[in-house]
């Protein structure tokens, strides 16, 4: 599976980076290898085969690769190989733009490190500060968190940074956007000089790449060409709906197709998510929804339900577009086309994870045609009109 990905993806990469074709060749700790195989990996994906070794060597790394190609496992394996488990102090700090992603990364680190007795805590807003303090005082090898809460814990001196040797910026394009930029700089200033920095994202626009110069020293770059970025094995379609008002009926017509496996429907605003959820329920369709204004507990419960397959159709904002991995999702619908073309790949990458087949359907009004063309041009891709037999493809 991962071999196919390796063959099909061409990387624009620093000169001295060789691909390693198996996890055994990486000289990883025995207990870590056990965790990797137990997690279901057999051979490394394109980004894993190149980046893991460089991270283990202690090099600063900038890695850009498609959604669903195992980027989280790439830096998690690098961390687990590099930390000293006999020192129960924070040695690796992972920053993510959303709480859900921070928790998911924590789960990946714990799963891969299952045989290593690794301590990893998710330090995120919307949860108990007291619990964070207790966990951090106990000692955590790895902290996965959102910038606001991590900054708070460092300032309170509960998150001690003296032994931190690795900083990971996941979904770096979002993290280095205006919203988080200052917090990231603040956190970086608290870290020991010479901290290794790993920057990871599916999209790394030029301005973000330039900004990474502030954090990195002579980084190894592992970059996928932009025209390689639309996802292998993902079918992309559009439905011409002419007017905004016609989208709802179109979605109702598609509902039976949505529930064949699991589907995610993206809207551009929280209000739209609430409105569409209510309309669908009034029409007797079963849906769940999630956005950033919901309390963390509620968001966790909804995610849990969706992961377990108890709910099959999730309506949400872009909060869900960032790296959330639910294996059964094979259909993504852009009820609204994303306002930011970089988010397109994050959204459609929710289907067809790690090389499974997936389908993305874009609802396009007359006003949206220009945005669709822009997305096609940006990713050098062609988005066709949806065929009648869409149910056979999901």
UniProtKB/Swiss-Prot annotation:
Its main location: nucleus. GO terms for molecular function: ATP binding; ATP hydrolysis activity; mRNA binding; RNA helicase activity. The modification Phosphoserine is found at residue 67. It catalyses: ATP + H2O = ADP + phosphate + H(+). GO terms for biological process: mRNA splicing, via spliceosome; nuclear mRNA surveillance of spliceosomal pre-mRNA splicing; rRNA processing. A motif (DEAD box) lies at residues 170-173. CDD domains: DEADc_EIF4AIII_DDX48 (cd18045), SF2_C_DEAD (cd18787). Residues 233-394 form the Helicase C-terminal domain. Its EC number is 3.6.4.13. Residues 52-222 form the Helicase ATP-binding domain. InterPro entries: DEAD/DEAH_box_helicase_dom (IPR011545), Helicase_ATP-bd (IPR014001), Helicase_C-like (IPR001650), P-loop_NTPase (IPR027417), RNA-helicase_DEAD-box_CS (IPR000629), RNA_helicase_DEAD_Q_motif (IPR014014). One of its GO terms (cellular component) is nucleus. It is found in: Nucleus, Nucleolus. ATP binds at residues 65-72. A motif (Q motif) lies at residues 21-49. It holds the Pfam family DEAD. Keywords: ATP-binding, Helicase, Hydrolase, Nucleotide-binding, Nucleus, Phosphoprotein, Ribosome biogenesis, RNA-binding, rRNA processing. The keyword Hydrolase applies. Gene3D superfamilies: P-loop containing nucleotide triphosphate hydrolases. PANTHER family: ATP-DEPENDENT RNA HELICASE DBP3. ATP-dependent RNA helicase involved in 40S ribosomal subunit biogenesis. Required for the processing and cleavage of 35S pre-rRNA at sites A0, A1, and A2, leading to mature 18S rRNA. Belongs to the DEAD box helicase family. DDX48/FAL1 subfamily. The Q motif is unique to and characteristic of the DEAD box family of RNA helicases and controls ATP binding and hydrolysis. This is ATP-dependent RNA helicase fal1. It comes from Schizosaccharomyces pombe (strain 972 / ATCC 24843). The lineage of its organism: Eukaryota, Fungi, Dikarya, Ascomycota, Taphrinomycotina.
């Amino acid at each position: 599976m991962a071999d196919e990905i390796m063959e099909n993806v061409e990387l624009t990469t620093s000169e001295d980076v060789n691909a390693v074709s198996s996890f055994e060749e990486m000289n990883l700790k025995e207990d870590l290898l056990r965790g990797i195989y137990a997690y279901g990996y057999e051979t490394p994906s394109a980004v894993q085969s190149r980046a893991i070794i460089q991270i283990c060597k202690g090099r600063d790394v900038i890695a850009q690769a498609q959604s669903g190609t195992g980027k989280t496992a790439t830096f998690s394996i690098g961390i687990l190989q590099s930390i000293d488990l006999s020192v129960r102090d924070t040695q690796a700090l992972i920053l993510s733009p959303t709480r859900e992603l921070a928790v998911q990364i924590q789960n990946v680190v714990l799963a891969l490190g299952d045989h290593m007795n690794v301590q990893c805590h998710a330090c995120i807003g919307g949860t108990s500060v007291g619990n964070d303090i207790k966990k951090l005082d106990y000692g955590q090898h790895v902290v996965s968190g959102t910038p606001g809460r991590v900054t708070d814990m460092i300032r309170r001196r509960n998150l001690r940074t003296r032994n931190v040797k690795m900083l990971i910026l996941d979904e770096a394009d979002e993290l280095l956007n205006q919203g988080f930029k200052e917090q990231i700089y603040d956190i970086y200033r608290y870290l020991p000089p010479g901290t290794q920095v790993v920057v990871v994202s599916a999209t790394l626009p030029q301005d973000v790449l330039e900004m990474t110069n502030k954090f990195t020293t002579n980084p190894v770059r592992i970059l996928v060409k932009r025209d390689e970025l639309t996802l292998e094995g993902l079918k992309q379609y559009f439905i011409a709906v002419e007017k905004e008002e016609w989208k709802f009926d179109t979605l109702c017509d598609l509902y039976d197709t949505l529930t064949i496996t699991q589907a995610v429907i993206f809207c551009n605003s929280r209000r739209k998510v609430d409105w569409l959820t209510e309309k669908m329920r009034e029409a007797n369709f079963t849906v769940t929804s999630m956005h950033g204004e919901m309390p963390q507990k509620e968001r966790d419960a909804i995610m849990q339900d969706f992961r377990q397959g108890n709910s099959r159709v999730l309506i949400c904002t872009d909060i869900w577009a960032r790296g959330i991995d639910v294996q059964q999702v094979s259909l993504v619908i852009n009820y609204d086309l994303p306002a930011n073309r970089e988010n397109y790949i994050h959204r459609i990458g929710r289907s067809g994870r790690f090389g499974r087949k997936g389908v993305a359907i874009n609802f396009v009004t007359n006003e949206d045609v220009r945005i669709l063309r822009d997305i096609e041009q940006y990713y050098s891709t062609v988005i066709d009109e949806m065929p009648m037999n869409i149910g056979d493809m999901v």
